[in-house]
């Protein structure tokens, strides 16, 4: 299906569903933070910090494991995909990319501020365009470039404190920051791969195999980390987190909404939009995260919050108001 041949009502519907995805992913920042904070309260700060990597890998394992189980149970027709080689190939590619992105993001979150994390993660908007140019010879127009830059810049300054400047985002780069940049690159690749794969195979079926692959990779990572770190003695403590409401509730929210529902909608509706336009829509994620954080008292309103929201929304508007002939040219040259 070519993007320029999609009916306006289908494109509009797809845009709304991808907007819903950004709202859900905005909440996941809060849910992940709540789960990590819960581990400190349950296990104690010292132990939680000592086995931080194990807890992170366990969280990713359970998040996608739960999502995979629920998906297979409630979408029986997709089980047919488990017998198809092309579905597994697509799921392997998407699953590996999704696992890499979420795993590196979670590794960095405990040691990075929400503002910097949101900004660096939003770089997948830029990476999507760059990967599209290098792999698919996709033309990026100057209007699209301006939109991407504005959206990325806006996402970056949303969480700055009142007395901070833009430079504060760049002067303290360490391992967590670079892990998040790697996460952003992988998410950009995932968007491109999703666009290509869901054009060829059933979106629901490939979502099922993708979730299974992410679960398996997460299990392998969890076991390797806990063995290498020689922390097998803490396995009982880690598993005991599953009976703690303050840990399991946000975990389930991430699994059912952040992983199952969001990725399902992404795989079904993203194919009706261009990859770069989809990435721009996803740039709204930090806006929702900021709004929700303010609502529940986790964030203070600053001049940077409003300036960032304005720049991000303006960037999206510039992209959406491009001349329709530019859309046609982009898709023709990507074939």
Question: Each predicted region: which residue ranges?
Answer:
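Glycine-/small-residue-enriched transmembrane alpha-helix faces in small-molecule transporters
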Residues: 1-58, 104, 168-196, 334-335
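C-terminal-most transmembrane helix of multi-pass membrane proteins
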Residues: 2-8, 60, 64-65, 143, ...
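Membrane-interface helix-cap regions at the ends of transmembrane helices
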Residues: 4-5, 34, 38, 65-83, ...
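Loop-to-transmembrane-helix transition segments
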Residues: 13-22, 72-104, 174-183, 233-261, ...
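Transmembrane alpha-helical segments that form core, pore/gating elements
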Residues: 22, 30-31, 68-71, 128-129, ...
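Transmembrane alpha-helices of multi-pass small-molecule transport proteins
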Residues: 38-100, 127, 186-193, 208-228, ...
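C-terminal transmembrane-helix exit sites in multi-pass transporters
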Residues: 48, 105, 124-149, 287-307
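Helix-helix packing/entry segments at the starts of transmembrane helices
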Residues: 99-103, 117-123, 194-216, 255-295
């Amino acid at each position: 299906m070519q993007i320029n041949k999609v009916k306006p009502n289908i494109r509009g519907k797809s845009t709304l569903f991808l907007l819903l995805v950004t709202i859900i992913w905005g909440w996941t920042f809060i849910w992940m933070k709540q789960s990590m904070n819960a581990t400190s309260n349950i296990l104690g700060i010292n132990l939680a910090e000592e086995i931080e990597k194990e807890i992170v890998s366990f969280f990713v394992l359970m998040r996608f494991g739960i999502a995979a189980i629920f998906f297979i149970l409630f979408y029986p027709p997709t089980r047919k995909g488990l017998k198809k080689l092309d579905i597994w190939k697509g799921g392997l590619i998407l699953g590996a990319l999704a696992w890499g992105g979420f795993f590196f993001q979670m590794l960095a979150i405990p040691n990075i501020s929400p503002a910097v994390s949101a900004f660096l993660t939003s770089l997948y908007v830029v990476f999507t365009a760059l990967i599209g140019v290098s792999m698919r010879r996709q033309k990026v127009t100057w209007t699209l470039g301006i939109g991407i830059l504005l959206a990325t810049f806006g996402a970056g300054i949303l969480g700055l404190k009142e007395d901070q400047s833009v430079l504060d985002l760049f002067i303290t780069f360490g391992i967590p920051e670079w892990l998040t940049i790697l996460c952003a690159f992988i998410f950009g690749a995932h968007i491109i791969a999703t666009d290509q794969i869901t054009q060829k195979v059933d979106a629901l079926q490939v979502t099922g195999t993708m979730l299974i692959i992410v679960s398996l990779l997460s299990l392998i990572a969890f076991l390797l980390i806990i063995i290498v770190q020689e922390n097998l003695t803490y396995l009982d403590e880690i598993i005991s987190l599953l009976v703690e409401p303050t840990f399991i509730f946000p975990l389930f929210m991430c699994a059912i909404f952040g992983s199952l529902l969001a990725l399902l909608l992404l795989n079904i509706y993203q194919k009706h939009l261009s990859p770069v336009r989809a990435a721009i829509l996803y740039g709204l994620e930090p806006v929702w995260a900021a709004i929700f954080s303010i609502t529940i008292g986790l964030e203070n309103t600053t001049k940077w919050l409003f300036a960032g929201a304005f720049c991000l929304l303006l960037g999206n508007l510039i992209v959406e108001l491009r001349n329709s002939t530019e859309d046609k040219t982009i898709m023709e040259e990507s074939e």
